[in-house]
Structures are given as C-alpha cells and as structure tokens.
Amino acid sequence: MFTDTINKCAANAARIARLSANNPLGFWVSSAMAGAYVGLGIILIFTLSNLLDPSVRPLVMGATFGIALTLVIIAGSELFTGHTMFLTFGVKAGSISHGQMWAILPQTWLGNLVGSVFVAMLYSWGGGSLLPVDTSIVHSVALAKTTAPAMVLFFKGALCNWLVCLAIWMTLRTEGAAKFIAIWWCLLAFIASGYEHSIANMTLFALSWFGNHSEAYTLAGIGHNLLWVTLGNTLSGAVFMGLGYWYATPKANRPVADKFNQTETAAG
C-alpha cells in the first residue's frame, strides 16, 4: 500500500546524499533556496495579517502560507523538515547510512538559516513596512515565540512537522492539482493551529531582529525557540512519518536497497 511512496522517499534520500557528497556548493545553495522560499511565505502572511482583526488572522495566514511549501516542492530545494522524513526512509531502506543522515541534517538546517536570514535582510533593505513599527505583529509574535516554555515549543514543533511531512508525503501519492490541495490543507492546519516550524521561525526572528523590536527580545530567546522546535520537528518527521509508515508497511512489502533507481524526486 505504501511501498511505492516509500521507494520514492528512499530514492530521494539517496539523491540528497549524492548531492551533498558530490556537489557541496550546490547542496548549500539549494538548502538556502528552501529557507528563502519559506521566508517569502512568512513575509506574505504577516503582511496580509498585520492590519486584520485578530479573530480572522489565523485563517488568513493559514490560507495563504501554502505558497511556501509549493515553492519548495515545485521549484525544487532542500528543506530540513522534509529531510527528516526522507532520510529516515533512506536509512531504513538502506539507500543511505545513519552517518550520512546525521551529517546531512545539520547542513540542511544551516543552509535553510542562510536563506531565511538573506530574505529578511532583503526585506529590511527594501524598507519593509512591518519592521519600523514596534506594534507590528512581527515583533509581538516573535517575542511570544522566544519566551514560550520548552515543552510547549517541542510538542508544537512535533505537530507542525507532522502536517508538513504529511503534505510532502501526499504530493508523492497524488497527481496534478491534488498536490496543491494537499499542501494547502496541511499548511492551513499548521498555521491556523499555531504550531511551530523551525525554518519558518528563522525568517520571522530575523525580521524582528532587523526591526524595532523589544529589549526583551534576545538571541538567547531565539536560540531557545529554535532548539526545542527543531527537536520537535525532527521527532515527527523521523518517527511519526518515517518510522510510522515504514512499520505500517508489511515486512514482505518493504523496499530493499537494490530496488532503488536513481531518479530524482521533489526535494521537499
């Protein structure tokens, strides 16, 4: 039932490992692109919601954030949160090793960070209207995220990436417009529910840092958020999705390494 999709994920893990090993610059550029694409989505949703009544903000923000994952998947780039799922399937299927997985994940995260900060810098240099005003939703949301309790961030991170990886998983199981519908629904649920995505937070934090933020907003708070959200994102991508669908597949139907072709799939 899930064998074909797992095969695609494991083959993509092998592609990611080859790209990282054979073309490190290309891998870092592609990772930065993913961070930038998610950042563009963050700028969009905060621009749209800044002047809205708080009661409708979650719906508007959720309904428009689908652009972020659409850009990542359709344009092609390397997103940390998607890699947590892809690389887990790769390890279980034997297309990559544990060592490769744990070497690639931090590189992807750092590459995403570069792209996220770069987009925030461009927005700031372009006179970003959200940044100079200390009452902007960017500053209030960023501060709230950096002061939230660790376990709240961890579990919100887990719920978030469960939805993100489900969106990616479903794009591999559908064709045509159904891919976009899957992305839209999952990201609507993630944003409207107030969950935490480490890469999306990177651009938000950079935007607030470059603007007229509160003195209570600190680098230590940013690090606190990104640590716990990243761990939560990793849990759901690797365990809930990767191991979950692996063990949901009958043992006789699970793929083995020699079945993989080297066809590239959407990076996610």
Model-predicted segments: where are they?
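Alpha-helical transmembrane segments and their helix-helix packing motifs
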Residues: 1-268
